[in-house]
């Protein structure tokens, strides 16, 4: 699959389980143009993807403020491997993270081009949350 110039978030996985994202290529360099945004997502494999996005390549989220606290469903058990990151940020945790993010594993990924941060943890003092990360 090839995604080009999609507006805003290209793939938003909301309250999803047991998902595999594999072999996607991106050329989508618009403002706030994320590649994959799993939110309240469990058991996700992201592999063999070439990102070239205008913002976050993978942005793991789990609810904003009261919505996240009420839902109490963390994003967890996420494996990201064998990916090429070229967007602004490689793997982002937050800032919507009120339900927590845990058991994230990143391996064998490359970062290049205009990528500012390989791993970026976005926080907000009002949102709370928990991160459990494996790299």
Model-identified regions with their sequence ranges:
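Extracellular/periplasmic carbohydrate-active domains that bind, remodel
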Residues: 1-135
């Amino acid at each position: 699959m090839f995604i080009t110039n999609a507006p805003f978030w290209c793939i938003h996985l909301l309250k999803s389980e047991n998902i595999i994202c594999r072999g996607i290529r991106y050329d989508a360099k618009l403002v706030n143009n994320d590649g994959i945004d799993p939110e309240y997502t469990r058991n996700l494999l992201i592999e063999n993807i070439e990102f070239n996005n205008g913002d976050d390549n993978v942005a793991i989220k789990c609810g904003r403020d009261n919505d996240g606290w009420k839902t109490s469903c963390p994003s967890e058990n996420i494996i990201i491997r064998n990916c090429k990151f070229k967007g602004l940020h490689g793997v982002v945790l937050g800032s919507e993270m009120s339900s927590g993010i845990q058991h994230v594993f990143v391996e064998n990924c490359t970062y290049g081009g205009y990528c500012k941060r390989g791993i970026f943890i976005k926080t907000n003092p009002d949102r709370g949350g928990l991160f459990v990360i494996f790299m």
